[in-house]
Amino acid sequence: MTPSFLMLVLAFEWNSKVAYAAQLREAMKWLGEQEGTVFLGQAVAVPGTAMFNTLTDVPLEKVFELPVAEEMQMGMVNGLALEGFVPVSIFPRWNFLLLAMNQLINHLDKISIMSNNGFKTKVIIRTGVGSQRPL
């Protein structure tokens, strides 16, 4: 069974005594154990970055570093989702995600409609929010 947002929420009960980053790392580890899940984005394979630090328990063969090309990244996510993968698309900052809105709104959102429900894509989009140090 492939993971979905609901399954992710149900799998992890919030523990206020554990740091947010530790719980995020645990959630990414769980996703990394699921068949078909891949992680791609910017700064995901660069040690010392906030995004990398939450992926330390994810198998390296599931993590793909991409250049700064947000629309291309979301296009890859669309293709992977159409092939049955569950891509976790990681953007280091939310304002980088804005550059991928064409692929997100005009393509990913409409795949099910355009294929007459032939494709039901599953995608997880993750981004950091904060003024200096989001995590």
Give, region by region, the residue ranges found by the protein language model.
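Thiamine diphosphate
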Residues: F5-L135
